């Protein structure tokens, strides 16, 4: 029986120092029914030189200016032909056996298949495991979101819509809240899918994302009080994390997550 077609989309911009590791980690899966798509935001470094070295391995390569991460994600969806789609961006590394694990778990009955993701501290090398949330309430405190571990069906994107270009950073949380509210079904796949380095575009200064967080709670059915509660919960979480890390840079992660390494 032929395995399902899986689309992997790598979004990149000036990622010459990291993208080759991402590409190699995907290609080394040796998955027989892979649709690999590259969406580049008109990089000015050697990103495209690296991409072109593997050009025959990709189904689609797009290199042009975009309107932000959400716009790039939507381009990736539009250019994908797989039954499920995962975004494995240019700071991420797919772990061995990931695609086989998803193919084995796929049953055609769910909209979103969520695997585990390892978070790596690039300063210390410490890794911890993030187990995904499969329920996203109006105020999504304690919800874990890592698009590197999410395989979303093309049908789900067609039904629930793509990524809101009004959201600059937590666009994956916005999508999951919207999809959950509209009845999306989730399946947890207990397998380590990918590793990503903490400190990337969507894991930096919480204050830059205030407008986004207030917006997505309100648009997904919350009121102003709930929106501000969620935002200041995140602010307080960051504050507590900094305090705990006085006892060691990885101390807060050790308390929050199951150990991986």
Give a label for each model feature.
Residues 85:
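Short aromatic/hydrophobic "clamp" motif used to bind/position activated sugar donors
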Residues 32, 40-49, 89-92:
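A conserved acidic beta->alpha catalytic loop
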Residues 63-80:
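Glycine-rich, basic loop-to-helix element that forms the pyrophosphate-binding segment
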Residues 129-216:
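Conserved nucleotide-sugar donor-binding catalytic segment
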Residues 17-20, 45-53, 93, 97:
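Acidic helix N-cap motif at the loop->helix transition within catalytic regions
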Residues 1-28:
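N-proximal low-complexity "stem/linker" segments adjacent to membrane-targeting elements
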Residues 93, 97-127:
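Conserved donor NDP-sugar-binding/catalytic core segment of glycosyltransferases
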Residues 4-7, 35, 174:
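Cell-envelope/extracellular polymer assembly enzymes that use nucleotide-activated donors
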């Amino acid at each position: 029986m032929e395995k399902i077609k899986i689309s992997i989309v790598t979004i990149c911009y000036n990622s010459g120092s990291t993208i080759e590791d991402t590409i190699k980690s995907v290609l080394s899966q040796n998955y027989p029914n892979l649709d690999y798509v590259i969406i580049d935001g008109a990089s000015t470094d050697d990103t495209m030189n690296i991409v072109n070295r593997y050009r025959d391995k990709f189904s689609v390569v797009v290199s042009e200016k975009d309107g932000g991460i959400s716009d790039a994600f939507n381009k990736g969806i539009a250019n994908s032909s797989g039954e499920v789609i995962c975004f494995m961006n240019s700071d991420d590394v797919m772990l061995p056996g990931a695609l086989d694990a998803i193919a084995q778990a796929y049953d055609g009955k769910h909209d979103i298949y969520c695997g585990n993701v390892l978070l790596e501290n690039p300063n210390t090398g410490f890794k911890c495991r993030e187990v995904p949330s499969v329920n996203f309430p109006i105020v999504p405190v304690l919800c874990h979101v890592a698009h590197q571990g999410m395989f979303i069906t093309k049908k789900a994107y067609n039904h629930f819509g793509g990524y809101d270009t009004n959201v600059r950073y937590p666009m994956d949380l916005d999508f999951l809240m919207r999809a959950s509210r509209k009845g999306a079904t989730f399946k947890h796949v207990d397998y380590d899918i990918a590793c990503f380095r903490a400190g990337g575009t969507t894991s930096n200064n919480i204050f830059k994302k205030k407008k986004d967080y207030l917006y997505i709670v309100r648009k997904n059915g919350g009121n102003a009080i709930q929106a501000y509660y969620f935002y200041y919960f995140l602010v307080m979480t960051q504050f507590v994390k900094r305090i705990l890390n006085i006892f060691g840079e990885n101390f807060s992660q050790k308390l929050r997550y199951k150990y991986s390494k």
